[in-house]
């Protein structure tokens, strides 16, 4: 039986992710876990996150799960979701007062920056709003096993003010337009991560989770 650990460090859409995974893999052992030994023992690991990056990283460091997650990132399929994607990079411009940046896990080279859309108009004449909140198309800029069965230009659900900017273009596998063309999906070796929420993205999102369950990087 496949065991999937959803990392519980106090920040993230845990139950919705667990429900989505249980839907596509009813025979899997899906666990929301705050235990390092369970994360190490799992076959696959999901790192969720929502809210502000500084809060997520502070909660993550306080959880005592850093080493277990870093070990998992080296040895088994890992999926980052929303702020969980941003946490994989080296640093984020979203920082607490008096700090220049928030350090990430450094598993993916690059940084996280804020939408700079002040005063910009959308094609329909309305102003862009930050955060981006709602459905948007995703262009599959590179082929990947987790895109299998997902039509290019499918809609996914986004809620975010910041986005990842990977240092290596070949690690960007999905892009979206919102005033600027930005990376919304990253992949390297056994890691795949999305800015959008697959668990809130209907059948296209469920297919991402289904592919993750069967992925053999």
Swiss-Prot record:
The active site is at 82 (nucleophile), 197, 199. One of its GO terms (cellular component) is cytoplasm. It catalyses: 5-[(5-phospho-1-deoxy-D-ribulos-1-ylimino)methylamino]-1-(5-phospho-beta-D-ribosyl)imidazole-4-carboxamide + L-glutamine = D-erythro-1-(imidazol-4-yl)glycerol 3-phosphate + 5-amino-1-(5-phospho-beta-D-ribosyl)imidazole-4-carboxamide + L-glutamate + H(+); L-glutamine + H2O = L-glutamate + NH4(+). Pathway: Amino-acid biosynthesis; L-histidine biosynthesis; L-histidine from 5-phospho-alpha-D-ribose 1-diphosphate: step 5/9. One of its GO terms (biological process) is L-histidine biosynthetic process. Gene3D superfamilies: 3.40.50.880. This is Imidazole glycerol phosphate synthase subunit HisH. It comes from Ralstonia nicotianae (strain ATCC BAA-1114 / GMI1000) (Ralstonia solanacearum). The gene is hisH.
């Amino acid at each position: 039986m496949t065991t999937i650990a959803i990392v519980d460090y106090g920040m993230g859409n845990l139950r919705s992710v667990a429900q989505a995974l249980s839907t596509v893999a009813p025979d899997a052992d899906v666990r929301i876990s705050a235990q390092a030994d369970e994360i190490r023992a799992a076959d696959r690991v999901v790192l969720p996150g929502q809210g502000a990056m500084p809060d997520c990283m502070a909660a993550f460091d306080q959880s005592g799960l850093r080493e277990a997650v870093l070990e998992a990132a080296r040895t088994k399929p890992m999926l980052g979701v929303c702020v969980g994607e941003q946490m994989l990079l080296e640093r984020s411009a979203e920082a607490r007062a008096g700090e220049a940046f928030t350090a990430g896990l450094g598993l993916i080279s690059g940084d996280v920056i804020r939408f700079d859309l002040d005063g910009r108009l959308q094609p329909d004449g309305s102003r862009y709003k930050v955060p981006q909140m709602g459905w948007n198309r995703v262009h599959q800029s590179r082929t990947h096993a987790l895109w299998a069965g997902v039509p290019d230009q499918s809609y996914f659900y986004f809620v975010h003010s910041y986005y990842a900017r990977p240092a290596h273009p070949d690690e960007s596998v999905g892009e979206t337009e919102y005033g600027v063309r930005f990376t919304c999906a990253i992949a390297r070796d056994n890691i795949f991560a999305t800015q959008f929420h697959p668990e809130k993205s209907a059948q296209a999102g469920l297919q991402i989770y289904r592919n993750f369950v069967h992925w053999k990087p």
